Curated annotation (Swiss-Prot):
Biased composition (Basic residues): 113-123
Name under which the protein is recorded: Small ribosomal subunit protein uS12
Pfam families found in the cross-reference section: Ribosom_S12_S23 (PF00164)
Gene this protein is translated from: rpsL
Organism ancestry: Bacteria, Pseudomonadati, Pseudomonadota, Betaproteobacteria, Neisseriales
Reported function: With S4 and S5 plays an important role in translational accuracy.
Self-association state and partner proteins as the record states: Part of the 30S ribosomal subunit. Contacts proteins S8 and S17. May interact with IF1 in the 30S initiation complex.
Length: 123
């Protein structure tokens, strides 16, 4: 615990805020074009082929975005909408593609949590 004299000399230091999604530039979502669609493997305890795409955003940033859900229709030059949200077991992936928006189709035959995957209500 500092003395009053130490506080007078130095003062308390504010914690430095680090932006977790710098490419969004304080916007909720951003549009971009896929430059590469590929699969990658997660970090140590997990094992899978995770679907990701490299996206060039309208503001010039180039980011890696995760494609959630089972199956997707994305390829190079697809126009996608990305939102913030990292994938814990994929290093460098800090964004998610929004399903059911622009060129990204919603997940087919999705019954639960449909709004997160752009699936329409089944008849």
């Amino acid at each position: 615990m500092p003395t009053i004299n130490q506080l007078v000399r130095k003062g308390r230091q504010k914690p430095v805020y680090v932006n977790k999604v710098p490419a969004l530039e304080a916007c909720p979502q951003k549009r971009g074009v896929c430059t590469r669609v590929y699969t990658t493997t997660p970090r140590k305890p997990n094992s899978a082929l995770r679907k990701v795409c490299k996206v060039r955003l309208t503001n010039g940033f180039e980011v890696i975005s995760y494609i959630g859900g089972e199956g997707h229709n994305l390829q190079e030059h697809s126009v996608v909408l990305i939102r913030g949200g990292r994938v814990k077991d994929l290093p460098g992936v800090r964004y998610h593609t929004v399903r059911g928006s622009l060129d990204t189709a919603g997940v087919k035959d999705r019954k639960q949590a449909r709004s997160k995957y752009g699936a329409k209500r089944p008849k």
